[in-house]
């Protein structure tokens, strides 16, 4: 195994990916230096060939090691932390000739069983949805041994503890230990996140219609497998490729309808923001249905039309107030069905103390009547009153692009036994499961 140190780069230097697409070799010598046993810097082998592209090569940066196949050319300017147990970076895959995102996760990530469960759930649903037109799955999953130990800066550890509200005693400061086996997850680098397109006003009315249509078709595909997505976040879960196609990613919040118990829906439902969560998911033991995703799709449609966020909610009460201000108070029967206990009391008290008109009409003053009708029938308190995905697709809004014959449902069956066993798996069992079920051959 060769070991290299990533040299400091000027952010404007993009030469790391200078190469001829039809070449069998890539020169990486100008970006990295090798260190021999005496600490002397030596030039690395400058040729990547089909015969050596899967050899392990280890790079050091800021005290951490990244061990990848030689065919992965790392862009050192893109290395970022993703929690205390992982880093993420962009690389060029010489074999596929594509820029990719690699996420490196320490096996220690699985010491936190909740994190481990979410990783396994993501892999299970990726396998289920693989091949779907609007699905982006990992291109490969591999593991490599650490070449050295690494302890992150104290500020990084403290920030992680504060942001996660975990017990500090549960955190290990030694995140990477020599000879630990780290997992690497490779995915195609998307052209844009959906949020990029929304917030930068890059879309005309035809673009909005097409993207919203593709969001609905992606949901219809997942729903055909009896699964709801639950986390329609345009920043982290939905991307747009170079051909302007919607791609769904991150399936760790997916919920198996008619099979998953309701307690599981709430037990491990962790999203980055409340802004896309349907009101019935905030509290309660309702029967969750595809209508949960219809609410999220309605929020996305609103944001596509407005060119900005619809809600900015970071806790349950704040989110319920934001919904209340937009569409008004729920009827008594709706409120009791959607929220329970303390939150129902909070909502009724908030309604009693506040008297103002909903902002819906003013918010969407620039939209046409067809768009307004869709929004009203997606963004409603009671999930039983929302349009289904099929009803939305039959709207005149899509009359020029909807092709009823062009839908291919998910034809795979979920391995329910593995799915149910997730909650009972211990850290070593989770890593063994990845080895057995998901790891690419070395």
Curated annotation (Swiss-Prot):
Q: Which keywords does the record carry?
A: ATP-binding, Kinase, Nucleotide-binding, Serine/threonine-protein kinase, Transferase
Q: Name one GO biological process term.
A: intracellular signal transduction
Reaction catalysis annotation: L-seryl-[protein] + ATP = O-phospho-L-seryl-[protein] + ADP + H(+); L-threonyl-[protein] + ATP = O-phospho-L-threonyl-[protein] + ADP + H(+)
PROSITE patterns assigned to the protein according to its UniProt record, in alphabetical order: PROTEIN_KINASE_DOM (PS50011)
Single GO MF descriptor: protein serine kinase activity
Where do the Protein kinase domain residues begin and end?
Answer: 74-398
Recorded protein name is Probable serine/threonine-protein kinase kinase DDB_G0280643
Which species does the entry assign this protein to?
Dictyostelium discoideum (Social amoeba)
